[in-house]
Amino acid sequence: MFPPARGKELLSFEDVAMYFTREEWGHLNWGQKDLYRDVMLENYRNMVLLGFQFPKPEMICQLENWDEQWILDLPRTGNRKASGSACPGSEARHKMKKLTPKQKFSEDLESYKISVVMQESAEKLSEKLHKCKEFVDSCRLTFPTSGDEYSRGFLQNLNLIQDQNAQTRWKQGRYDEDGKPFNQRSLLLGHERILTRAKSYECSECGKVIRRKAWFDQHQRIHFLENPFECKVCGQAFRQRSALTVHKQCHLQNKPYRCHDCGKCFRQLAYLVEHKRIHTKEKPYKCSKCEKTFSQNSTLIRHQVIHSGEKRHKCLECGKAFGRHSTLLCHQQIHSKPNTHKCSECGQSFGRNVDLIQHQRIHTKEEFFQCGECGKTFSFKRNLFRHQVIHTGSQPYQCVICGKSFKWHTSFIKHQGTHKGQIST
């Protein structure tokens, strides 16, 4: 048996209509107004096609003529049912008739057919409204169900404003896709362009679609390799304005030579040439003692201190000297920090945990560093370096006074003691 149906005469257009105040109407853009007009007219046409009999509402007459003044003159939502206004010349509403059992069955059958037609109509409406969630939050049909309850059987009221807070936020700026209100006019205008299907630009090279023309023009420079932004000082051209702005800082800081790889600027061309070797991996500076190569001359000079044995960096606390400043800084932590790291084997304390770990290798006999020539292992890396001199035969430690060379640093230090008291002529 088909579900009971509600009589067509009991359902009027006012049940599916929606009205606005003057203030609410002013907050809608043209795209939203057109959408509202299409939905109301389609609701009315569907009800007529489905056999609902009632006079043509004045609202539909005004919408067909697209006269905006109707929204300001028609009665408010709260008392619109009492008005019952209709277009001039329309017939009065049909009175209810008492149906016979046969007529009741016919009405039930027709109602079931109507529900199928309404479902198809609702799916078409849903396709039009799915992009405007904030404008139409609930737009679907309620179909007849079994039981004594009569379903409304048609498109429910457009829920433009769900609650009072939502209405306030709508007037201030409406919502984004996540349901959050826009708090900036620029974001709102960008959102409205989407709602009104603003014109988009498609790249003919890669097919990418870009909404704004400025972004589209900037994107096309990637394909055509255009550099329209030129520096007036040196003539160098750039693809983007932001890159030109960064480049201008080189001239303002009196650093006209800029590295194209990292953007760093230099005062002299020689500095730029030396810097570029970092990117090209070029190492033209070679140590004459160990043949190790370097990309910068300053790095070579720091390296040569190892061979000369010179220790210019001296600790003011204990007088110990070091060849590198970084080594001195590590040493000074011994004086500035308490020796909180204590060896459990011998009780010796250290200021750094890394020193304690190295010290513990003496007790554990662990040997992590292996010689590639003979396979011998060592607990400390410095011991491995001293051992490798045996295989290479190099004598990296040279006396600057007599020119004699030594394999071991300890031998070099002992030799320098023989020159004490000598005065250079």
From Swiss-Prot:
Entry-linked Gene3D superfamilies: 6.10.140.140, Classic Zinc Finger (3.30.160.60)
Protein family according to the UniProt entry: Belongs to the krueppel C2H2-type zinc-finger protein family.
Alphabetized Pfam families for the sequence: KRAB, zf-C2H2
Compartment(s): Nucleus
CDD domains membership: KRAB_A-box
The species this protein was found in: Homo sapiens
Protein name: Zinc finger protein 789
GO CC list: nucleoplasm; nucleus
Single GO MF descriptor: DNA-binding transcription factor activity, RNA polymerase II-specific
Chain segments annotated as coiled-coil in the UniProt record: none
Major subcellular location class: nucleus
Stretches assigned to the KRAB domain: 11-82
SUPFAM superfamilies from the UniProt entry: beta-beta-alpha zinc fingers, KRAB domain (Kruppel-associated box)
Keyword Zinc-finger: yes
Any GO BP annotation: regulation of transcription by RNA polymerase II
Zinc finger (C2H2-type): 201-223, 229-251, 257-279, 285-307, 313-335, 341-363, 369-391, 397-419
Listed SMART domains: KRAB, ZnF_C2H2
Sorted UniProt keywords: DNA-binding, Metal-binding, Nucleus, Repeat, Transcription, Transcription regulation, Zinc, Zinc-finger
InterPro entries in the record: KRAB, KRAB_dom_sf, Krueppel_C2H2_ZnFinger, Znf_C2H2_sf, Znf_C2H2_type
Known role: May be involved in transcriptional regulation.
